[in-house]
Amino acid sequence: MADDWESAADSEVVILPNAANNINKWEGEDDDEDVKESWEDEEEKKDEEKPTKTEVPVKPKPTRALKAKLEEEERLREAEEEKRLANLTPEEKFAEKLRVKKMQEESDMKHTLDTFGVTSISGGLESFNPESKEEFKEFGDTLSWKVAQFKESPHFPQFVEDLVRSICVNLSAADIKKVKINVELLHSEKLKLEKANTKKPIGKGKGKVSLRTENDDIDGYQKYGNDFTDDYDDFM
């Protein structure tokens, strides 16, 4: 018995690997885990490579204090402009009036061009080549606007007279008659406006009482008869 123990002690001791590490693992399972880890690494790299979106800062709305400050600055600018205009000479005021009026006319003209769909008149009046009624209307509006810029000149009335005459030369007698009728109607309207704008001075004090007699009426009839006779002689 002792001999068997001695022989067993003399024999080599073989250490088996720990089987616990391989429990519940199938063949090739370690390889799958390695592949999974490599995929996760690649996904992390892609996420790192994606460009970050730059956020556009939102413009804050003006506060009450800022709004009040802007209104105050606008009020100061208007006050400075009024002060500047007050110090101008009559000639400078007239020139400033023309400048403001020209700016207003240019703004009105731009609005008219936008209405007709015209984007630019950089080519001048020569760029127009009207054919339809609407195109002639557009051309006329542009020409009238251009001519009206010089209406403050003392030579403007004579210029318009010569211009109308030179244009009407190309018309027939019937068309000139139509132009004449339109001008006469415009003349009548202008007279009405001028009379309405002209205020007649109101006389002060009581009016004098006049005494009319039958002789006054007879004299009036005789005068009317004499005038009628003279007119008749002139006609004959």
Curated annotation (Swiss-Prot):
PANTHER family noted in UniProt: EUKARYOTIC TRANSLATION INITIATION FACTOR 3 SUBUNIT J
General function of this protein: Component of the eukaryotic translation initiation factor 3 (eIF-3) complex, which is involved in protein synthesis of a specialized repertoire of mRNAs and, together with other initiation factors, stimulates binding of mRNA and methionyl-tRNAi to the 40S ribosome. The eIF-3 complex specifically targets and initiates translation of a subset of mRNAs involved in cell proliferation.
Record GO terms (molecular function): translation initiation factor activity
Biased composition (Acidic residues): 28-46
Keyword hit for ATP-binding: no
Listed name of the protein: Eukaryotic translation initiation factor 3 subunit J
Organism expressing this protein natively: Drosophila willistoni (Fruit fly)
Domain of life: Eukaryota
Subunit structure comment from the entry: Component of the eukaryotic translation initiation factor 3 (eIF-3) complex. The eIF-3 complex interacts with pix.
Pfam family membership, one: eIF3_subunit
Keywords: Cytoplasm, Initiation factor, Protein biosynthesis
Region Disordered, annotated ranges: 20-88
Family indicated by similarity: Belongs to the eIF-3 subunit J family.
Gene Ontology biological process terms, A to Z: formation of cytoplasmic translation initiation complex; regulation of translational initiation
UniProt biased composition (Basic and acidic residues): 47-58, 68-88
Keyword Hydrolase among record annotations: no
Record gene name: eIF3j
Subcellular location: Cytoplasm
GO cellular component, one term: eukaryotic 48S preinitiation complex
